[in-house]
Amino acid sequence: MVRQRPYTGGAYIAIAEPALIAQLSTVRVYAMASSVDMRKGFEGLYALATQQMGREVLRGDLFLFVGQTRKRAKVLYFDGTGLCLLHKRLSKGLFAALWRDSQTPHLELSQTELQLFLEGSEAI
């Protein structure tokens, strides 16, 4: 998407905006298979994704993290220009427990499963 913004002297310049999540057909979704301290930010979640999950964040994949109370979830991804962090807190209900029967450090979800999960569905 290209938009214009005012520039000094009244001239306008066009700036390209990066897509929120580029090339969705090639993006993979990984979920941490244990609860995460929701106080963690960019660096803490990046470390979990690379060290515990063994994945490279800068490929552009999505990384889902859920807090112990299951009221909050965060999604970390790299959009090509920097790290992005989405944070959702449910006003009622709980997110599904991804770590219920997991034997691995992470799970791989489809994009549809991620969407259902973030909407509060138990279908995972």
Model-derived regions, located:
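Polybasic/polar functional segments that serve as interface/processing modules
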Residues: 2-124
